[in-house]
Curated annotation (Swiss-Prot):
Cofactor: FMN
Subunit composition and interactions: Homotetramer.
PROSITE patterns assigned to the protein according to its UniProt record, in alphabetical order: FMN_HYDROXY_ACID_DH_1 (PS00557), FMN_HYDROXY_ACID_DH_2 (PS51349)
Name of the protein this chain belongs to: L-lactate oxidase
Annotated ranges, domain FMN hydroxy acid dehydrogenase: 13-369
UniProt enzyme class: oxidoreductase
Positions in coiled-coil regions: none
Keyword Flavoprotein recorded: yes
Family assignment from sequence similarity: Belongs to the FMN-dependent alpha-hydroxy acid dehydrogenase family.
Recorded name of the encoding gene: haox
Length: 369
């Protein structure tokens, strides 16, 4: 255990015997300090949308298929021209040093071990270059919270390009911080600095809450901003935080190379729909023009299957990976991915689907309780 400014950072490095991801969360709560756990696990206001992200997966059911001669399903896929061994990826999540002393560096190692993709956050505990290097050549994206300071944006985009990342994720649903009651109750302020802010900003984020940090980000974002980012970098730009078909088409029209359906894990607009409930409509509007990425609420292999069958090309997981990081470092991250991949393989076989392409063509039953 390492103590920084009174905050205890875990140093665990071990494989995990994962039963399910809900149990993993309970285990992580025991070892992550209260303020850090509240920041990681919490949603906005009374967390209605956070809960809806889980309930939404009950709105569709997978049709079992038995007489299909299927065995040994294959998880390999290719998105943005990037070959991947799993359709799962690690979402951009801030300040992973709250869970483990090595933070994003260990997350990158764990994701690389399963042949997956990781997305770095602007507000990472470790630098773009260090995180990319620790991934041993595995593909990574970099997520940008667009700053009011264009020089800051350019510096991050330039470093991301030098570090070899494969795409830029532009977050557009965080022009103001959601009202996060857990952070208020815990009077939570980041106890450790954010490496990219340390390097390129006058303030490293240490000793501040997320609302104060967001205050330096752009308070309004439009399609012209998407175009500006897309014109500046030659990397594909994926627009994150899309929940309406209209916004998806605006983003594509402005130069987006990908659409990322997400409600920020229920941390922003409380009272909005679950991301899974809007995924199919957004994917239909996109109509194959660009890849569709999805996150929010994934906890089971069946959730992954349903997301892929509803139009997602890549499926993101966030909090469970951070819990795995806290409990086991890089090996813990690897354990979380392997558990979900295993569940997905079982579901694929029972649903008569051999490949991820088969899953994407699978029909789901629409049922509302």
């Amino acid at each position: 255990m390492v103590v920084v400014n009174g905050y205890k950072q875990n140093e665990n490095e071990k494989k995990l015997n994962v039963l399910n991801l809900d149990q993993l969360e309970k285990q992580a709560k025991e070892i992550i300090p209260t303020g850090g756990f509240g920041y990681i696990s919490g949603g906005s206001e009374d967390e209605w949308t956070l809960r809806e992200n889980r309930r939404a997966f009950t709105h569709k059911q997978i049709v079992p298929r038995a007489l299909t001669n299927i065995e040994k399903p294959e998880l390999e896929t290719n998105v943005f021209g990037i070959p991947l061994k799993t359709p799962l990826f690690m979402v951009p999540a801030a300040a992973q040093g709250l869970a483990h002393v090595k933070g994003e560096v260990d997350t990158a190692k764990g994701v690389a071990a399963v042949g997956g993709l990781m997305a770095q956050s602007t507000y990472s505990s470790t630098s773009i270059a260090d995180t990319a290097a620790s991934g041993t050549g595995a593909p990574q994206f970099f997520q940008l919270y667009m700053s009011k300071d264009w020089d800051f944006n350019e510096a991050l985009l330039d470093e991301a390009k030098r570090a070899g990342v494969k795409g830029i994720i532009l977050t557009v649903d965080a022009t103001v911080d959601g009202y996060r009651e857990a952070d208020i109750i815990n009077n939570f302020q980041f106890p450790i600095p954010m490496a990219n802010l340390t390097k390129y900003s006058e303030d490293d984020g240490q000793g501040k809450g997320i609302a104060e940090i967001y205050a330096s980000a752009a308070q309004k974002i439009g399609s012209d901003d998407v175009a500006r980012i897309a014109n500046y970098t030659d990397l594909p730009v994926i627009v994150k935080g899309i929940e309406s078909p209209e916004d998806a088409l605006y983003a594509i029209g402005a130069g987006a190379s990908g659409i990322y359906v997400s409600n920020h894990g229920g941390r922003q607009l409380n009272g909005g729909p679950a991301s899974f409930d809007v995924l199919e409509d957004v994917a239909k509007a996109v109509n194959g023009k660009v890849p569709v990425i999805f996150d929010s609420g994934i906890r089971r292999g069946s959730d992954v299957f349903k997301a892929l069958a509803s139009g997602a090309d890549l499926v993101g997981i966030g909090r469970p990976v951070i819990y795995g990081l806290a409990l086991g470092g890089a090996q813990g991250v690897q354990s979380v991915f392997e558990h979900l991949d295993h569940e997905l393989e079982i579901i694929m076989q029972l649903a008569g689907t051999k490949t991820i392409s088969d899953v994407k063509n699978a029909k789901l039953l629409n049922i509302r309780y």
